[in-house]
A protein has these predicted regions:
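Basic/aromatic recognition patch in beta-strand/loop cores that engages polyanionic ligands
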Residues: 38-82
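Arg/Lys-rich, positively charged N-terminal/basic patches that mediate binding to nucleic acids
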Residues: 1-25, 29, 98
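Generic detector of well-ordered alpha-helical segments enriched in charged/polar residues
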Residues: 12, 27, 44, 82-87
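Enriched for short, Lys/Arg-rich terminal
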Residues: 2-4, 16-17, 63-98
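Short proline/glycine- and basic residue-enriched helix-capping loop/turn segments at helix->loop/beta transitions
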Residues: 32-37
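Context-gated lysine
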Residues: 23-25, 41-44, 91-92
C-alpha cells in the first residue's frame, strides 16, 4: 500500500516554480518515496529522524510519519538544503546577508 504525501503550501509553490524538467524529476522521485519511504538516506545528528532523497543537484528532505504519511520538510539545492532544513525544524530566523 502506498503512503500519502503531506506538504506545506510553500513547498507546493516551490515545486510549481521549478524548471519543467526538474519538476518532472521531483514528481518521479516523490512517487518513488511514496512507494518505499525507506529508499532515502537516513540523516544523522541534528537531522535525525529525517531522510534525504537525491534529485540531480537537489535534495528532497522528508520524514515518515504515523498513518502511512510522508511529510515533506524541504526541497532545495544540495549546497544549502541541510542548513535550511535545520533552520526550519528549529524555527531559527534567517540572518540577513552582508
Amino acid at each position: 500500500m502506498r503512503h500519502r504525501l503531506r506538504a506545506a503550501p510553500q513547498i507546493a509553490v516551490l515545486i510549481g516554480g521549478l524548471h519543467p524538467q526538474i519538476k518532472k524529476k521531483v514528481r518521479s522521485a516523490l512517487e518513488r518515496i511514496l512507494s518505499n519511504p525507506l529508499c532515502g538516506k537516513a540523516l544523522k545528528d541534528e537531522l535525525d529522524g529525517l531522510r534525504s532523497f537525491p534529485v540531480g543537484r537537489f535534495r528532497i528532505v522528508y520524514r515518515i510519519a504515523a498513518g502511512r504519511v510522508v511529510e515533506l520538510v524541504a526541497i532545495g539545492s544540495r549546497e544549502r538544503i541541510y542548513e535550511e532544513t535545520y533552520r526550519l525544524i528549529t524555527k531559527k530566523p534567517t540572518l540577513p546577508g552582508p
